Amino acid sequence: MDKFWWHTAWGLCLLQLSLAHQQIDLNVTCRYAGVFHVEKNGRYSISRTEAADLCQAFNSTLPTMDQMKLALSKGFETCRYGFIEGNVVIPRIHPNAICAANHTGVYILVTSNTSHYDTYCFNASAPPEEDCTSVTDLPNSFDGPVTITIVNRDGTRYSKKGEYRTHQEDIDASNIIDDDVSSGSTIEKSTPEGYILHTYLPTEQPTGDQDDSFFIRSTLATIASTVHSKSHAAAQKQNNWIWSWFGNSQSTTQTQEPTTSATTALMTTPETPPKRQEAQNWFSWLFQPSESKSHLHTTTKMPGTESNTNPTGWEPNEENEDETDTYPSFSGSGIDDDEDFISSTIATTPRVSARTEDNQDWTQWKPNHSNPEVLLQTTTRMADIDRISTSAHGENWTPEPQPPFNNHEYQDEEETPHATSTTPNSTAEAAATQQETWFQNGWQGKNPPTPSEDSHVTEGTTASAHNNHPSQRITTQSQEDVSWTDFFDPISHPMGQGHQTESKDTDSSHSTTLQPTAAPNTHLVEDLNRTGPLSVTTPQSHSQNFSTLHGEPEEDENYPTTSILPSSTKSSAKDARRGGSLPTDTTTSVEGYTFQYPDTMENGTLFPVTPAKTEVFGETEVTLATDSNVNVDGSLPGDRDSSKDSRGSSRTVTHGSELAGHSSANQDSGVTTTSGPMRRPQIPEWLIILASLLALALILAVCIAVNSRRRCGQKKKLVINGGNGTVEDRKPSELNGEASKSQEMVHLVNKEPSETPDQCMTADETRNLQSVDMKIGV
């Protein structure tokens, strides 16, 4: 029985579908020299074989090219592609950007025979001029279950039962409409499947145990110009429940917004090898897999095209085609823009807030600064550094784009700065922070570079800097985790004493340029245990001016200086001292830079050291180690606790109170190493909420348990008369005065249970009750 009802339900569904296919509407235009246009069930649902059958049903034939030209001369024009004998054409008299690619005459579309269009028919018995009389019959149709409705130009409708199709494939596919068709309008055209390009971009992704390549599959897909939005946003969402136990990851959502709309978009879908995914997902599936989907929406620019945007939902037809004559032409290729491809794009270059997302699980055992599941980044090369003057202590740098690079094994390759950088923009926001690696080093079981290795690398960098300082390369690191930079204090930023930083929460690209004081001092502090470069937040300006060390520098070729990369927001030193996070947009990689001191002419090399991270925000201990005995002052007066070794081998600058940081210096080697303890993981919010709920439930349970029984030491209340004004076997009228009250009290006391007093009742309370009884008896 169940099977019967099941088949009945399926039969009813199929019947509804079949009934939906039994309705055909044929829109017919006026006849011009016998040629007219027929549209079935909306636009472009007629195949070539069905077109011949349809014209035959109207007692007509497919027109030839000569007949179409004759009808064109009589005033016949449409904005619909239709079949004629051997071609698909649009007759146009007036040029229109959305019809036949702004062409006039009988425009021929080069297409395949499998596409669906409208059709043109020629009736030899029609008048030689224009004829707009209503068509009331389909004379050559035969019997069939289909309801055929003829819709004339004036709105009159005539229906009949029958069929005109002779090919079974046309009957079966009666409702299939080809998407590869349109009226010639770019606002109606969707991208044909044949024009989706698949591009594979190889990118090196070395890991700890293997050096393999992964490919990012970039699908170039076009979006119809009906999308009339001001920006395309790509959201990246990362949910990592494993790292939430360590307080090192949160569910974040970033949005990157280009400034203009576009008709084409580059969708980048990273595809990592299965071999890498196995190491990431073998444990994370127990909680919740990490989701990282990246889509970079940009607008492409084609030379020789013009910008055009049409209103959403605008569908040109014969009634409104004259209203759109003001739209310019998209291309002059001779092929309709809407049929085969979209040749028009918004000719703009958007500024994209390139925010990357480093999705690293604790199962990844190697430092990874560029996860394959993040967007491609662009790099900025700071070249041709021109010094303005020696008195201003400033430099102008010009950013030049260069191809992105991903360098991860920085223990072996220290010749170049190890970071990918995002192109700085004057108006776009670029959030870039430095991923802390204390957790990675702890779990990887891998030691950071030793001071000797850093010293060797620094010597190589010093030599290259002395030889060619204009080609000095500064890169920026663009990553998501801001947990490390939250602990940085302005004392680690390259700003001299007397510099003040402004806290300005705005998207404006114009920020004040840091001007040095009379005796500027600059700190260049680097990290020893960190395998990546130090994150330094600096303000943005069109000409970056910064201070040099200890007085006026000498203008010579051997004096390399470090520049400051731009950022769109700035953080005040006051906020940093309070422990607030520093809003950074770009971070600077300063590894192994060499500077000279004018008084001693000695090269001081900055060795990377590790800030000792404490439990209190804003308290960071950093160590600056140099080769010579120099005096380096703190950048924040009155807010530092600095000490200088008399031997001049190291200098330790401590900001805040040392709660968890302990530093030990090796005076012989000249390098101060700071042992940064492992930071205790932060307690997740959900765990705090759960503990609070449990504590509240426990308190509530205790209160209920206590209230359910008599409390220890609680006295019973004696209610005179019990509120009802009667005493046992006596009426109130019989009792009067003090005797009545005394008898009532005696009665209530005598009605107390004769059992022993409560175990919690004290001896004093028992004595008081006995004295009350004695007084009442007397």
UniProtKB/Swiss-Prot annotation:
One matching Pfam family: Xlink
Cellular component GO terms, alphabetical: apical plasma membrane; basolateral plasma membrane; cell projection; cell surface; external side of plasma membrane; extracellular region; lamellipodium membrane; macrophage migration inhibitory factor receptor complex
Keyword Transferase: no
Region (Disordered) residue spans: 251-277, 293-338, 351-370, 391-591, 628-678
Glycosylation sites: 27, 59, 102, 113, 123, 183, 368, 425, 529, 545, 603
GO molecular function: cargo receptor activity; channel regulator activity; hyaluronic acid binding; type II transforming growth factor beta receptor binding
Modified residues (Sulfotyrosine): 410
Membrane topology field: Single-pass type I membrane protein
Residue intervals passing through the bilayer: 686-706
Modified residues (Phosphothreonine): 726
PTM section of the record: N-glycosylated.
Main localisation: membrane
Alphabetical list of PROSITE patterns matching this protein: LINK_1, LINK_2
Extracellular topological intervals: 23-685
Tissue: Expressed in the intestinal epithelium.
Low complexity: compositionally biased ranges: 251-270, 427-437
Secretion signal, residue range per the UniProt entry: 1-22
Localization (cell): Cell membrane; Cell projection, Microvillus; Secreted
Record's function text: Cell-surface receptor that plays a role in cell-cell interactions, cell adhesion and migration, helping them to sense and respond to changes in the tissue microenvironment. Participates thereby in a wide variety of cellular functions including the activation, recirculation and homing of T-lymphocytes, hematopoiesis, inflammation and response to bacterial infection.
PANTHER family, per the entry: CD44 ANTIGEN (PTHR10225:SF6), HYALURONAN RECEPTOR (PTHR10225)
Subunit structure: Interacts with PKN2. Interacts with TIAM1 and TIAM2. Interacts with HA, as well as other glycosaminoglycans, collagen, laminin, and fibronectin via its N-terminal segment. Interacts with UNC119. Interacts with PDPN (via extracellular domain); this interaction is required for PDPN-mediated directional migration and regulation of lamellipodia extension/stabilization during cell spreading and migration. Interacts with RDX, EZR and MSN (via FERM domain). Interacts with EGFR. Interacts with CD74; this complex is essential for the MIF-induced signaling cascade that results in B cell survival.
Stated name of the protein: CD44 antigen
Gene name of the encoded protein: Cd44
